[in-house]
From Swiss-Prot:
Active site: D511
Domain named RNase H type-1: residues: 1019-1142
Listed name of the protein: Gag-Pol polyprotein
Region Interaction with human PPIA/CYPA and NUP153, annotated ranges: 189-227
Disulfide bonds: none
Record's keyword annotation contains Glycosyltransferase: no
Gene: gag-pol
Motif residue range(s): Nuclear export signal: 16-22
Length: 1433
């Protein structure tokens, strides 16, 4: 049981074991509860020795009490155990835990009343502030005020939200102001779930505590009366000091601020944790070529906060690195500001510099100065008849830039009509005379739409326009002669026009997103035929009239008209293309997100596969249209990258759809953080008075792609029979199917919606990809006005919201759901009825059923999923089992009647009810009012091969709790089909296993129950079976059997078995042959783990047999003993089953290894290598050494540097100076004790080091001895470069600093073997260099440095040979081409082949097809030589 079982002895132990865990319960306290409590106290950084006295228990209760409200169940259990133990110490008679808690509460109330009475007697005049943890009470004593749950809650929230970002440190400092070590430990305990971070923090505290003990040696002899002892490092950390001692130290005269000291240690540890969680160095923060200066400054200062440096060093970083790492544009401006410029001046000066807009402005200014001749050439290439117009700013009137890039103050009034009171975007004149022959405004009065601007690849807004066609337009004035001004309309409002159809005038919407023209009821002559078309509300029936004449603003067309119940008249693309109307799609003006390939990778170079003629024609048409809209651009042969494309027909359509196979590019593209981790759920929506659902049209094609990345999206449309070279394109916008598109689009959309959300807090916007749900409690008129405002806001940024998918009335179709004003459901689900099912069909069926299960209770898919087991092709035929057919029929019946869910009401409580369906399947409903489900679901996951219902029930509850936190932000109250007694039994034995929230019993059959129970203590009088099994890995033969305490034994032979199966077989044998009560002893942790979890079913047949035997028994006790430790029965049965099965391994090197470890304290890797020991044995030798358990092993060989680099530093031990040199690449150490820390001694040591090893660079700190003239002279003479670390930054000397600690640790292990420190230092150097193995290559440091130096020499020699080889050139022939190619560079020459490099391509050429000649250079070639003749040719 361990040392902690001795907390209670004699009569007190008897009293302890009589106290019940719960009122009326069967279980009572045991010694194991004391052992558990002592381990828990160690985990919470409390001294377990405090359990031995009543006062100690009081201290523990005071420490734990503030955490009871916010703490876990474990803290509450610990508090209950300590309170009961306190009553036993005080000899207060209690029957159970509840009575003990009541007694403790009475005692605490009495003491509290006494304190309050004393405070009242003292009067108000002497009251002091209650804002600090240590305050003065009424008697003038300094008492501790416990840290509040509110403070703890704030600290936990900071850690959970910020995840150890730099902001955590100042927050911790603020929250822990004036705190005692006890308070600080309580704060750390509340975030104990972050195990890795807490372990790092613990290591730092231990190091600092050890350093404190070294700097403050303990006073020898007894303390004088009345004098308090000096605190040790562990006292400051609160592990060996009481709260009263901490208060005395903090309030003494002179005070010892143990709280502040401990806080400083914790902050040191937090700094290390922050560095781990924010691994980017300040040196790596550089401004991108297109990154705005503001964003660069944000990143710089965020990283600066994480740097472990003083304020002076951070100031130096800000002054130098901020300017040094800016991009060239910003750097020029910043240097012009001079030294000492404030951050405000820098940001003002660099505003607008560095981003794409700045580049565009500079380019525009450069182009405006281009010569007229060059401009004329460009005009001819672009098919323009006249000279280009220079762009002119509406705001300041200057040429060379646009108004949106203008830096001058904004001119008042409208830029379109000149009137004040509104801006151009709100101008009412902009829609006048749509599609007229002349533009609305005269030359010079407003913005002129030049043909140049219409042709740009990145227009700023979508504009339908008429192509040059039958009726050319008049010229727009003298200045614009030769240039065509096309009529156009900006889509600030819906493009409604008057059209003439069959002599009737009607108003219709120009809709480039619609394939067909659809009109409301209109009488048309001629015959018609019926047709069904798809719309947003489902399918509608229409009448189709062919060859109908239509006139739009004087333009005539003839085509098909559909007449039916459409909400608005639509002129579709079938008519718009005839009159030459095109749509200029906007590319959003927001800044592009920079994208890169993964390091070391190049773009895709996948060849285009052959395509059929119809697919090539379809792709040509699609790409022509995309090019006109600016989505793609043609490219030349200079782009070496390619991605294959293909085409498929749209569902239920004759139209084609272009698909690009971006799999190869996706592999090579950098990874993106998934902006949205899941889809929003309608059960989490709050009921709203007004709702609208919008869809963003051509979502990805509205966001620009990073210009530098566009080249990697290149693709080719081939020609039939290779008639002509393929036409090459690249994307200008986010492509469909590329891995970065979703993340970049979501990020861009969030930034665009942010200002609208801030200005309209009453509007709730759910955004997922291109679907927007907008809800509010406004009246419908106000709500729709806000929706139009939102649509206009999106349009400014280039995102359209088509009317076709603008849903104003319920039911709303959103994210696969159907939303009604007071309820929701999934969109109608039709299960297919097939004669034969393929794997793909079953996969789709299971997907549909899983989707339906969130609102239809009782859906099951277990047997359908079993049909998919194994590696099967998608087209394989699967025959349904009888169980799967029954499951499918039940699901059809469930889906027959529609089921609805309701919306969430924050004022009401959430309730979750769980039912067991059988066959490891569970269903649940989450609701606030009975029979009105918010959401339903199912659970059919099996956590392990061996399980039981109680364990599965806890998994179901945890799934529901997680789901509820995601959707509603809180956990529901649970109603579970399990009796309290069953849960109590499980909880008593397995209380560490899981957590469960508040719940109540519901009598809904089938109830969950435990089928058998293992005893916790041996059964007196029952026979004891020692069981064991063994198997041979090669032959798969094995034995299993048992030996009993009464002399019985049985051994059986097994075939095709394993060690684990044999161990289980032995237990099954013992259960089979034993009586109703039995004790079983095994040495298998595997078997023990399976059976102790009390499974009632398993996937393994053998385990099912064991379960059947267990259910039949009245009592079973199962115990474990370690193998091969000479334990009686276990040793006997082990010999019986091992005979002829196990191979015996004689470890005769153990004694020698132990002897060497006692002398050198070498690590386990060195012993395993030198003495041929298994790692587990070598680790056991280290573990049993008391001197090697101070701290874990240091890691070596983690840094990869040049062979000649050494780091030097001086460290102090026992009042003496040790100079240490570390070879960075290998970790090899040279060290010695020097008489003084002077430049002369340091220079002498450097010369000794250079005489032993090749030293090219030494890296030191800025100490006076290292910066002295003597060291500089020594370095100059030995031709050594000296480098210095960053001031006050220990990380710059990280290797030697860590080696200093390692060296001191080894010295501590061997110090008692040496009389003088200098001897111990050399012993420690020897041990480190030759007796510790690990790191790169698994060598010792001595072996590694020799290997590195030898490799360096070989590499240099090889490099010389390579250099000689590279002086030769190779002419070669390919297998099919008889022409000699070259000259190529010779990389390697072998017996049968040569390796060459030709135009960056490396090739292997057979020796017989290569001619090798020396490259003498052209300067040696005369007129008559071969080189000269070749040049002439």
């Amino acid at each position: 049981m361990g040392a902690r079982a001795s907390v209670l002895t004699g009569g007190k132990l008897d009293a302890w074991e009589k106290i019940r865990l719960r009122p009326g319960g069967r279980k009572s306290y045991k010694i194991k509860h004391l052992v558990w409590a002592s381990r828990e106290l160690e985990r919470f950084a409390l001294n377990p020795d405090l359990l031995e006295t009543a006062e100690g228990c009081q201290q523990i209760m005071r420490q734990l009490q503030p955490s009871l409200q916010t703490g876990t169940e474990e803290i509450k259990s610990l508090y209950n155990a300590v309170a009961t133990l306190y009553c036993v110490h005080q000899r207060i008679e209690v029957k159970d835990t509840k009575e003990a808690l009541e007694e403790v509460e009475k005692i605490q109330k009495k003491s509290q009343e006494k304190i309050q009475q004393a405070a009242m007697d003292k009067g108000n005049s002497n009251q002091v502030s209650q804002n600090y943890p240590i305050v003065q009470n009424a008697q003038g004593q300094m008492v501790h005020q416990a840290i509040t749950p509110r403070t703890l809650n704030a600290w936990v929230k900071v850690v959970e939200e910020k995840a150890f970002s730099p902001e955590v440190i100042p927050m911790f400092s603020a929250l822990s102001e004036g705190a005692t070590p006890q308070d600080l430990n309580l704060m750390l305990n509340t975030v104990g779930g972050h195990q890795a971070a807490m372990q790092m923090l613990k290591d730092t505290i231990n190091e600092e505590a050890a350093e404190w003990d070294r700097m403050h040696p303990q006073q020898a002899g007894p303390f004088p009366p009345g004098q308090i002892r000096e605190p040790r490092g562990s006292d400051i950390a609160g592990t060996t000091s009481s709260l009263q001692e901490q208060i005395t130290w903090m309030t003494g005269n002179p005070p010892i601020p143990v709280g502040e000291i401990y806080k400083r240690w914790i902050i040191l540890g937090l700094n290390k944790i922050v560095r781990m969680y924010s691994p980017v160095s300040i040196l790596d923060i550089r401004q991108g070529p297109k990154e705005p200066f503001r964003d660069y400054v944000d990143r710089f200062f965020k990283c600066l906060r994480a740097e472990q440096a003083s304020q002076d060093v951070k100031g130096w970083m800000t002054d130098t690195l901020l300017v040094q790492n800016a991009n060239p544009d910003c750097k020029t401006i910043l240097r012009a500001l001079g030294q000492g410029a404030s951050l405000e001046e820098m940001m003002t000066a660099c505003q607008g510099v560095g981003g794409p807009s700045h580049k565009a402005r500079v380019l525009a200014e450069a182009m405006s100065q281009a010569s007229g001749a060059a401009a004329a050439i460009m005009m001819q290439r672009s098919n323009f008849k006249g000279p280009r117009r220079t762009i002119k700013c509406f705001n300041c009137g200057k040429e060379g830039h646009l108004a949106r890039n203008c830096r001058a103050p904004r001119k008042k009034g409208c830029w379109k009509c000149g009137k004040e009171g509104h801006q151009m975007k709100d101008c009412t004149e902009r829609q006048a005379n749509f599609f007229r022959e002349n533009l609305a405004f005269q030359q010079g009065e407003a913005r002129e739409f030049s043909s140049e601007q219409d042709r740009t690849n990145s227009p700023t807004c979508r504009k339908p326009r008429v192509r040059r066609g039958d009726s050319p337009l008049p010229e727009a004035g003298d200045e614009g002669k030769g240039a065509i001004s096309l009529p156009q309309i900006t889509l600030w409002q819906r493009p409604l026009v008057t059209v003439k159809i069959g002599g009737q005038l009607i108003e219709a919407l120009l809709d480039t997103g619609a394939d067909d023209t659809v009109l409301e009821e209109i009488n048309l002559p001629g015959r018609w035929k019926p047709k069904m078309i798809g719309g947003i509300g489902g399918f509608i029936k229409v009448r189709q009239y062919d060859q109908v004449p239509i006139e739009i603003s004087g333009k005539k067309a003839i085509g098909t008209i559909l007449v039916g119940p459409t909400p608005i008249n639509i002129i579709g693309r079938n008519m718009l293309t005839q009159i030459g109307c095109t749509l200029n799609f906007p590319i959003s003006p927001i800044e592009t997100v920079p994208v890169k390939l993964k390091p070391g990778m190049d773009g895709p170079r996948v060849k285009q596969w052959p395509l059929t003629e119809e697919k090539i024609k379809a792709l040509t048409e699609i790409c022509k249209e995309m090019e006109e809209e600016g989505k793609i651009s043609k490219i030349g042969p200079e782009n070496p990258y390619n991605t294959p494309i293909f085409a498929i027909k749209k569902k239920d359509s004759t139209k084609w759809r272009k698909l690009v196979d971006f799999r190869e590019l996706n592999k090579r593209t950098q990874d993106f953080w998934e902006v949205q981790l899941g889809i929003p759920h309608p059960a989490g929506l709050k009921k709203k008075k007004s709702v609208t659902v919008l869809d963003v049209g051509d979502a990805y094609f509205s966001v620009p792609l990073d210009e530098d990345f566009r080249k990697y999206t290149a693709f080719t449309i081939p020609s039939i029979n290779n008639e002509t070279p393929g036409v090459r394109y690249q994307y200008n916008v986010l492509p469909q199917g590329w891995k970065g598109s979703p993340a970049i689009f979501q990020s861009s959309m969030t930034r665009i919606l942010e200002p609208f959300r801030a200005n309209n807090p009453e509007m709730v916007i759910y955004q997922y990809m291109d679907d927007l749900y907008v809800g509010s409690d406004l009246e419908i008129g106000q709500h729709r006005a806000k929706i139009e405002e939102l649509r206009e806001h999106l349009l400014k940024w280039g995102f359209t919201t088509p009317d076709k998918k603008h849903q104003k009335e319920p039911p709303f179709l959103w994210m696969g759901y159907e939303l009604h004003p007071d309820k929701w459901t999934v969109q109608p689900i039709q299960l297919p009825d097939k004669e034969s099912w393929t794997v793909n069909d079953i996969q789709k069926l299971v997907g549909k059923l899983n989707w339906a299960s969130q609102i239809y209770p009782g859906i099951k898919v277990t047997h359908l999923c079993k049909l998919l087991r194994g590696a099967k092709a998608l087209t394989d035929i699967v025959s349904l089992t009888a169980e799967a057919e029954m499951e499918l029929a039940e699901n059809r019946e469930i889906l027959r009647e529609p089921v609805h869910g309701v919306y969430y009401d924050p004022s009401k409580e959430l309730i979750a009810e769980v039912q067991k369906q059988g066959l490891d399947q569970w269903t649940y409903q989450i609701y606030q009012e009975p029979y009105k489900n918010l959401k339903t679901g199912k659970y059919a996951k099996r956590g392990s091969a061996h399980t039981n219902d109680v364990k599965q029930l806890t998994e179901v509850v945890q799934k529901i709790a997680t789901e509820s936190i995601v959707i509603w932000g809180k956990t529901p109250k649970f109603k579970l089909p399990i009796r309290k007694e069953t849960w109590e039994i499980w909880w008593t034995d397995y209380w560490q296993a899981t957590w469960i929230p508040e719940w109540e019993f519901v009598n809904t059959p089938p109830l969950v129950k435990l089928w058998y129970r293992l005893e916790t203590e041996p059964i007196p009088g029952a026979e004891t079976y020692y069981v064991d099994g063994a198997a041979n890995r090669e032959t798969k033969l094995g034995k299993a059997g048992y030996v009993t305490d009464k002399g019985k034994q049985k051994i059986i032979t097994l075939t095709e078995t394993t060690n684990q199966k044999a161990e289980l077989q032995a237990i099954q044998l013992a259960l089979q042959d034993s009586r109703s009560e039995v004790n079983i002893v095994t040495d298998s942790q595997y078997a023990l783990g399976i059976i102790q979890a009390q499974p009632d079913r398993s996937e393994a047949e053998l385990v099912n047999q064991i379960i059947e035997q267990l259910i039949k028994k009245e009592k079973v006790y199962l115990s474990w003993v370690p193998a091969h430790k000479g334990i009686g029965g276990n040793e006997q049965v082990d010999k019986l089953v091992s005979s002829g099965i196990r191979k015996v391994l004689f470890l005769d090197g153990i004694d020698k290894a132990q002897e060497e470890h006692e002398r050198y304290h070498n690590n386990w890797r060195a012993m395993a290598s030198d003495f041929n020991l298994p790692p587990i044995v070598a680790k056991e030798i280290v573990a049993s050494c008391d001197k090697c358990q101070l701290k874990g092993e240091a890691m070596h060989g983690q840094v990869d540097c040049s062979p000649g680099i050494w780091q030097l530093d001086c460290t102090h031990l026992e009042g003496k100076i040790i100079i240490v040199a570390v070879h960075v690449a290998s970790g090899y150490i040279e060290a010695e004790v020097i008489p003084a820390e002077t430049g002369q001694e340091t220079a002498y040591f450097i010369l000794k080091l250079a005489g032993r090893w090749p030293v090219t660079v030494i890296h030191t700190d800025n100490g006076s001895n290292f910066t002295s003239a003597a060291v500089k002279a020594a370095c100059w003479w030995a031709n050594i470069t000296q480098e210095f670390g960053i001031p006050y930054n220990p990380q710059s000397q990280g290797v030697v600093e860590s080696m200093n600690k390692e060296l001191k640790k080894i010295i501590g292990q061997v110090r008692d073997q040496a009389e003088h420190l200098k001897t111990a230092v050399q012993m420690a150097v020897f041990i480190h260099n030759f007796k510790r193995k690990g790191g790169i290559g698994g060598y010792s440091a001595g072996e590694r440095i020799i290997d590195i130096i030898a490799s360096d020499i070989q590499t240099k020699e090889l490099q010389k040979q390579i250099t000689k080889i590279q002086n030769f050139r190779v002419y070669y022939r390919d297998s099919r081409d008889p022409v000699w190619k070259g000259p190529a560079k010779l990389l390697w020459k072998g017996e049968g082949a040569v390796v060459i490099q030709d135009n960056n391509e490396i090739k292997v050429v057979p020796r017989r097809k290569a001619k090798i000649i020396r490259d003498y250079g052209k300067q040696m070639a005369g007129d008559d030589c071969v080189a000269g003749r070749q040049d002439e040719d």
